[in-house]
């Protein structure tokens, strides 16, 4: 009853903000994202009928408190579906920095859900597994189905699931990841989202924005898709900044990257757009032809960069790749 899985983190394109059901982590509205590769999380799980307690280890450190509670929500859902109460050992490692706005919770819970479902011998499609991953992080649902994916808010626990969107943009997209370290508190931001006076304004346009993003992806329209993502980042930030806690995640270098991107676009006609989730780090979306110029301009802002492509769905790995 042991399995190992890998999943890629996500960049939110039309991001969800706030949850109407916090226990099952069901968001107020639909969302669309793209997975980033080769960044990934790898997770090994083993159900142990004779063990007395669950053990969760991330990056070599045992997880306790709220982090353990979120993992247990995913584990408990798998146990419920499998019809047993075996204890589990879970170990996970990231190939990229966590908690700076690069979607590590998405890849983490997606890999966990995929490995747990396999170890429990559940015969499930990826959209079905996405409903399990969602118990840890709604973004993880989209990391299960991979590439460009759409999480439907749905009417219930079953149809609040992710499905992949086919698009010609997958091969040419290059993502320059600008690392701007700064602590973030995404869970609290979600908890108070509806208390922002900007939240209803966001809800008023988000459904049309989802439709526009799907159309742009279906049409393979790079500029339309990533201009929408850039605008959505600003809308999300406005809602977060005007919540009760007044969260401001951006740092001076975040703004410097924004300005560098707009300068490339306006003065050099480079197809390039920025995007942020809840964090100070920045995704810069461009094409293979222009990625070197974009990376050079972003590096001039004094930030570390990586270049990523589009990542596929979560997958079960061979037993030889187990972490324990």
Swiss-Prot record:
GO molecular-function terms, A-Z: ATP binding; phosphomevalonate decarboxylase activity
Domain of life: Archaea
InterPro entries recorded: GHMP_kinase_C_sf, Mev_decarb, MvaD-like, MVD-like_N, Mvd1_C, Ribosomal_Su5_D2-typ_SF, Ribsml_uS5_D2-typ_fold_subgr
EC number: 4.1.1.99
Role: Catalyzes the decarboxylation of mevalonate 5-phosphate (MVAP) to isopentenyl phosphate (IP). Functions in an alternate mevalonate (MVA) pathway leading to isopentenyl diphosphate (IPP), a key precursor for the biosynthesis of isoprenoid compounds such as archaeal membrane lipids.
PANTHER family: DIPHOSPHOMEVALONATE DECARBOXYLASE
Protein name, entry field: Phosphomevalonate decarboxylase
Origin organism lineage: Archaea, Methanobacteriati, Methanobacteriota, Stenosarchaea group, Halobacteria
């Amino acid at each position: 009853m042991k399995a190992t899985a890998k999943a890629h983190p996500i960049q939110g394109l039309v991001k969800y903000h706030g949850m109407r059901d916090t226990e099952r982590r069901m968001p107020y509205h639909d969302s669309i994202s793209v997975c980033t590769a080769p960044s990934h999380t790898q997770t090994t799980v083993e159900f142990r009928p004779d063990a007395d307690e669950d053990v969760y280890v991330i990056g070599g450190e045992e997880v306790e408190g709220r982090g353990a509670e979120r993992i247990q929500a995913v584990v408990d859902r798998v146990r419920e579906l499998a019809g047993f109460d075996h204890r589990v050992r879970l170990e996970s490692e990231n190939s990229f920095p966590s908690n700076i706005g690069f979607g590590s919770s998405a890849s983490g819970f997606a890999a966990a859900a995929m490995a747990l479902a396999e170890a429990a011998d559940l015969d499930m499609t990826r959209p079905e597994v996405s409903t399990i991953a969602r118990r840890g992080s709604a973004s993880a649902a989209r990391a299960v189905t991979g590439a460009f994916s759409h999480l439907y808010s749905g009417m219930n626990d079953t149809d609040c699931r992710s499905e992949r969107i086919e698009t010609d943009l997958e091969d040419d997209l290059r993502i320059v990841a600008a690392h701007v370290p700064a602590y973030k508190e995404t869970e609290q931001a979600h908890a108070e989202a509806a208390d922002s006076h900007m939240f209803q304004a966001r809800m008023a346009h988000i459904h049309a924005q989802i439709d526009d993003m799907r159309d742009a992806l279906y049409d393979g329209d790079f500029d339309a898709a990533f201009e929408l993502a850039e605008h959505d980042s600003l809308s999300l930030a406005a809602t977060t900044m005007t919540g009760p806690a007044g969260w401001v995640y951006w740092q001076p270098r975040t703004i410097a990257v924004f300005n560098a991107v707009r300068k490339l676009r306006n003065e050099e006609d480079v197809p390039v757009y920025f995007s942020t989730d809840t964090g100070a780090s920045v995704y810069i979306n461009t094409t293979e032809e222009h990625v070197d110029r974009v990376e050079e301009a972003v590096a001039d802002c004094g930030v570390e960069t990586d270049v990523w492509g589009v990542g596929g769905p979560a997958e079960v790995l061979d037993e030889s790749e187990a972490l324990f």
